Amino acid sequence: MHLYFSCFILLFVPGGKSLGINSHLKHMSNKSQDQVNRTRTVGSKDVAALPLSSYMFNLYQSFHHSELNHGMEAAPSLSLNHRADIIRSLAVKSYDHGGSLWTFLFDFSSLSQEEEHQFAEVRFDFRAFSDAILVGMEVIVDFFHQSSTCQSISGFCQSYLYVGSLTSTLWPRSSDTWVTFEATDIIHKWFERNDKGKNHSEGHMKQPKKLHRAKSAERRYQQRSTENPQILMMVYSNISKKEKLSGTATLLQDAAHSKYLAVMPGIQTIANSRRHRRSHIFNEHIMGMKHVPSADSSRTLCRRVDFFVDFKQIGWDSWIIHPVKYNAYRCEGECPSPVNERLKPNNHAYMQ
């Protein structure tokens, strides 16, 4: 039995995606699309299925080509990407623009305060707004937050959390049609509100002028979604120094300290973890797990043991040139699943 572990991070949450850097990027596009197709059938009915971001897949391919060519030409801001452990994209939930006044509505709840955030930028395809904006025009952008849990079949929630504003000049990149502008200050303001405990204060809950009516906002969003502008906020971050010093967690290390050593259907869902970087799907799958105070020393937890394969012994030696005998290893013992999320499985080594 072989266990394969992956060191990259790719989380699909409502309104957001993220990725980490490693060398296994070549065939990720098709696999990710299959995963999304599967998760759409089990997800909440209130959350609309989001199309996969072509920019994120181009980013995957850029890393793959840069590893093959050992160059720095493939990806936009590639030097910055290589300095980031995690690249997360947040898809806009709704937007509106009228001349120089713009309004973007994001869900920032997937951002983790435990990470070291280096940089953030907003990007969109200039061609989707070519009839409404001019090259070089200056715009004022208001950023609002709305959690995905506020979504319902009837429409958007009535209240939005104002995060901050910025002024930017719209210049398409010379190499493509993407318009980008820095939004690092918006991310910092979001975490400042969390630190001060004001993210639920009524003083910061208000109706943006461009989204003052839920029905109207929903209608405008549906009309523009057909153009698929792919307005994204890219957030570049590193894992914390403490987590780096602790080393990369593995599935076996996590299982050895897991508190979920027995399965009992019907138990309530365990409370959501504070670590938002983990997929929300994980929280849905830990229903029915019996909480045990600690691992019993009499239990034999999963470990790797020898498993020798001798082709001569099974009569295949005339077919096999090399190796005639090798150690394939196997897993023996009890392997509790899921692992305790309070540990640090930063390689996301969950059994598939």
UniProtKB/Swiss-Prot annotation:
Signal peptide boundaries: 1-18
Cited InterPro entries: Cystine-knot_cytokine, TGF-b_C, TGF-beta-rel, TGFb_CS
Pfam families: TGF_beta
Record family assignment: Belongs to the TGF-beta family.
Gene that produces this protein: nodal4-b
Entry keyword set: Cleavage on pair of basic residues, Developmental protein, Disulfide bond, Glycoprotein, Growth factor, Secreted, Signal
Protein name: Nodal homolog 4-B
Self-association and partners: Homodimer; disulfide-linked.
Glycan-modified residues: N30, N37, N199, N238
